[in-house]
From Swiss-Prot:
General function of this protein: This is one of the proteins that bind and probably mediate the attachment of the 5S RNA into the large ribosomal subunit, where it forms part of the central protuberance.
UniProt keyword Cell membrane present: no
Domain of life: Bacteria
Molecular function per GO: 5S rRNA binding; structural constituent of ribosome
Family label: Belongs to the universal ribosomal protein uL18 family.
Quaternary structure, from the entry: Part of the 50S ribosomal subunit; part of the 5S rRNA/L5/L18/L25 subcomplex. Contacts the 5S and 23S rRNAs.
InterPro entries, alphabetized: Ribosomal_uL18_bac-type (IPR004389), Ribosomal_uL18_bac/euk (IPR005484)
Signal peptide: none
Protein name in UniProt: Large ribosomal subunit protein uL18
Record Pfam families: Ribosomal_L18p (PF00861)
Length: 122
């Protein structure tokens, strides 16, 4: 039996999770994508198939503050706070957290904790 690569393991977990994580207008889905260099998060209404708001380490608002954010937990927490601020501004308090098949650890956990501290409930 061959061992799956980390990327395939992540994709397999994500497919398994997405069967149960469905966001709607009252409680949209907070989806997280983590690459080697950046982290992206967006609040999605699956029933209308629209992205309500998003934030990432390549976001224009964050690039104005510093030239390049490193790929660490501090950057992820900044993205989490920014996303929560934007979601609350649009009237969203509760979300369903979709970790994107990644383990709830490190950068993904830092983003989630920062979003909770900024006022999102999940």
């Amino acid at each position: 039996m061959t061992k799956l690569s980390r990327k395939l393991q992540t994709q397999k977990r994500h497919r398994r999770l997405r069967r149960f994580l469905i966001g709607d207008a009252t409680r949209p889905r907070l989806s997280v994508f983590r690459s080697n260099n950046h982290i992206y998060a967006q609040v999605i209404d699956d029933s209308a198939q629209t992205t309500i708001c998003s934030a990432s380490t390549v976001d224009k608002e964050l690039r104005e503050k510093s030239e390049k954010l490193p790929s660490d937990c501090n950057s992820s927490s900044i993205v989490g706070k920014l996303l929560a601020k934007r979601a609350i501004k649009k009237g969203i308090k509760q979300v369903i957290f979709d970790r994107g098949g990644n383990l709830y650890h490190g950068r993904v956990k830092a983003l989630a904790d920062a979003a909770r501290e900024a006022g999102l409930e999940f």
